[in-house]
Amino acid sequence: MKLLSITFLFGLLALASANPLSPGNVIINGDCKVCNIRGD
């Protein structure tokens, strides 16, 4: 079940990264205001 949730999370990140219309401040967790999807 843990692996499934991790795979699902990476799937969501891949979709968000591939979407040119996604804003730069995609909320990944509750209190993240200015998240960078790529993490840099």
UniProtKB/Swiss-Prot annotation:
This is Bomanin Short 6. The lineage of its organism: Eukaryota, Metazoa, Ecdysozoa, Arthropoda, Hexapoda. Residues 1-18 form the signal peptide. The keyword Signal applies. One of its GO terms (biological process) is response to mycotoxin. Disulfide bonds join 32-35. It is found in: Secreted. InterPro entries: Bomanin. Secreted immune-induced peptide induced by Toll signaling. Has a role in resistance to bacterial and fungal infections. The strength of antimicrobial activity appears to correlate with the overall level of expression. Residues 19-23 form a propeptide. One of its GO terms (cellular component) is extracellular region. The keyword Disulfide bond applies. It comes from the Eukaryota. Belongs to the bomanin family. Transmembrane segments: none annotated. Keywords: Disulfide bond, Immunity, Innate immunity, Secreted, Signal.
